[in-house]
């Protein structure tokens, strides 16, 4: 990385979408400036950099603006070649992309929908979420991480979203969503993630995060 390179990340402390970008930048050893945003009072910088989406994360690299977390992760991987994030094999790379979409589209949609329901109306959505997470359980069989022996793209996407976001929301509601008995590979993977310094450095503080997720769930239910 050149000495005069500018790398800025606009994000939110509790957002898995910006946490995963920090994980990738730390894996690559790329120095960056982090700018905390407030989506209820969006900064003029965020609106200028992302006038259409108006969402985080936003990466700024030498004046170029990159949005959407999956796109940003791939940009980081292609710009700084060392410590690859995506699998080198084309088939494995395509599979990682498909599973990342499963996480951020299907699991997120059903998982967050479960937060909006009362206890009685939550059961069907919880079971649907478990069925989707079982796809990840099968993919992790016999592996330390999704890519094998080292963390990468899908670990950042799934890790930031499920154990370190959705599970905390469910914990706040008293729901044990992903048991070790039914999901042994998944739980082994989460334990391995907690041993990775760059991941741990980017995980929001647990109690503060659970409180935040509880407040968000209350807002969803009362909307």
Swiss-Prot record:
User: Where is it located?
Assistant: Cytoplasm, Cytosol
Source species: Arabidopsis thaliana
Q: What's the main place this protein lives? A: cytoplasm
Signal peptide residue numbers: none
| Swiss-Prot/TrEMBL keywords | Cytoplasm, Detoxification, Phosphoprotein, Transferase
Q: Which gene encodes it?
A: GSTU6
The protein's matches in Gene3D superfamilies, at most eight in alphabetical order, are given as: 1.20.1050.10, Glutaredoxin (3.40.30.10)
Q: What is the official name of this protein in its record? A: Glutathione S-transferase U6
Q: Which family does it belong to?
A: Belongs to the GST superfamily. Tau family.
Task: Kindly report, in one word, the top-level EC class recorded for this enzyme.
Answer: transferase
Q: Where is the GST N-terminal domain?
A: 5-84
Q: Which Pfam families match?
A: GST_N (PF02798)
According to the entry, every stretch annotated as the GST C-terminal domain falls at 89-216
Where would one find coiled-coil regions in this protein?
Answer: none
Where on this chain does glutathione bind? 15-16, 41-42, 55-56, 68-69
Molecular function GO terms recorded: glutathione transferase activity
A Gene Ontology cellular component where this protein is annotated is:
peroxisome
Q: Which EC number applies?
A: 2.5.1.18
